[in-house]
Amino acid sequence: MKSVITTVISAADAAGRFPTASDLESVQGNIQRASARLEAAEKLAGNYEAVVKEAGDACFAKYAYLKNAGEAGDSQEKINKCYRDVDHYMRLINYCLVVGGTGPVDEWGIAGAREVYRTLNLPTASYVAAFAFARNRLCCPRDMSAQAGVEYAAYLDYVINALS
């Protein structure tokens, strides 16, 4: 699984060298942010059902036409699949917070997602809206500390940009 630490080690090994001072600074920064990332992961895990529901609701509020006949959410089964996808990505974001890198999202979420969604006639903009809502709804310190919020929002932004 890709993280800052595994990326630094892999790059140094591929070049047949020890990690540079710059490499080690990158690792140190990652380690220093670990506490905030773990706080964000804990808060997300403790409230993920509400986060997923609110994000999914925001998606269908913004793109109400998706519930029309012939659209991606024209049955309860399809609507449930949308919420399932949002849940899946939120779990991957949680894993990224724990790992300290984008590996989980890259490996289990992003690779090929846009192509799959296009094939299934699922507009990625609706997922982007769901994750943007989750990001914009975040309130520090109500939900988590400011630094934890920065870490959480960064992974939401990563998913938003990847699906855009």
UniProtKB/Swiss-Prot annotation:
Does the keyword section mention Chloroplast? yes
> Where does this protein hold (2R,3E)-phycoerythrobilin 1?
82
A Pfam family this chain is assigned to: Phycobilisome
The principal location of this protein is: plastid
Q: Which Gene3D superfamilies match?
A: Phycocyanins (1.10.490.20)
What is this entry's stated membrane topology?
Peripheral membrane protein
Q: List the disulfide bonds.
A: none
List ligand-binding residues for (2R,3E)-phycoerythrobilin 2: 139
Q: Which family does it belong to?
A: Belongs to the phycobiliprotein family.
* Oligomer and partners: Heteromer of 6 alpha, 6 beta and one gamma chain.
Any idea what this protein is called? B-phycoerythrin alpha chain
Recorded name of the encoding gene: cpeA
